[in-house]
Amino acid sequence: MSPRSFTASYHRPYLAHGSIGPSCAVAVAADDHLEIWTHSQGVHMLRREIGRALAIPADRLVVRHVDGSGCYGHNGADDAAMDAAVLALAAPGRPVQVVWSRADELSWSPLGPAGVVRLSADCASDGTVMAWRHEIWSGSFISRPGMTPNPAFLAASHRAGGEEIRSAGEPPQERGGGASRNAVPGYDFPSCKVVNHLLTTMPLRTSALRSLGAHLNVFAAESFMDELAAEAGRDPVEFRLAHLSDPRARAVLEHVVRQSDWVSWTPSDVVGHGIGYARYKNSSAYCAVVAEVEAVAEVRVRRLIVAVDAGLVINPDGAANQIEGGAIQATSWTVKERVAFDRFTVTSDDWESYPILRFSEVPAVDVEFLPGAENPPLGVGECAQGPTAAAIANAVCDALRVRVRSLPLTPEQIVAAMPDR
């Protein structure tokens, strides 16, 4: 029998950082020196770029890091620091505090870019994947201060007459990639091709957001794996294991299956379970997630079961916190979050128009680490984003028999995906 070919496209919208508190900075200019307090993730690059933008020598500029309310890449913290610096220079000797409003934060801070992934697979008669093609269309995740051709600040852009803040493009795969992160599949496919269509012009300013392109790429690839398994009439776990030879990858999948009691699952009309797997950046922690969801008026994630191989885990509590936080944030992205905008501006500028997961909606998260003291430590901070999104989407399909390929999984998106429409 000749191979069968399958194609599907997946989409995610622009995403905001959605930190509980907005960006803030304090600056003081005195005695020919400027001192700034900021919750920026990159104080060294920020110091260099503020010095470049304001023509301040490095020996006259001090930038101090303080804790903020949550930053998952490049949010508005650097812009708030630049704002405070400009104002402090205009009021020498007086401390200046800049606190962005909620509307400022949601409208003007850099966003995680929207993207589309188109997947194609040629499969043998038993469903075995013989060839895989992964195409991405996305804006850049790299426009932090210090990485761009011109100073990456709104204030600097304004002072330059509205000059566009240009992105730094796409980091190479050996550094994890950007939009293409986790586009290279972790499965044993005889033929694989990845094409990254980097969009250099986007309607909204974009930059780093937790896991970069891995969130979309893993959501797409793991959703497609479930679809291919269904076409072949095979269990989604068995189908994945049949394409995996890496013993650590297999062990993570097998562990989460036991941990979640996958084989005893009884299907229900409104409750479903689904699985997602990836090795973050193809070089960091292995992560497999099983999601249990209830889909009635809206999607409610009841429970996330997470198995991780991170090698030697030096601080188990800290590592578990990172994975739990990533899984909860990915849940919010997957079922709720989407930046809305019109021809002129971002319109989702408050919690009503840009809802995030409420504390009452946070699912139970059960994280288990596989023994790995004999292996070097692996990064865990962003490994759960993609597998969680895929597991939830696959669980929704299990509950409703509707495959939703566009995030977030809102009632409107589910209705739009129904086959009779």
Feature roles, as predicted:
Residues M1-R421:
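Cofactor-binding beta-sheet edge motifs in enzyme active sites
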